[in-house]
């Protein structure tokens, strides 16, 4: 069985109402709309934290901010004992990478003697 490709998009300062896939007629987002039409489009999502780094930490771990220790703060040291979904994907044989801003601001910590890449290689 072929594994699915996984594309996770985060757009700072954009809301659901800014994409055609959600019914917007005044902003053109044809590429996003095409990907959404062929994949999974979430319709009931809420931010767990109003700050960017804690919100991203929740997305990466599947945990609420209050469960993340120091990672629940805006500028922090990410706890080494908390695994992120990108690490689980790498362990399963996926290639993981990001473009733009991954998890930040803060210190992602170390893993296996090197700086931890919470969102994959840049």
Q: Which role fits each region the language model picked out?
A:
Residues 1-122:
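Formylglycine-dependent sulfatase
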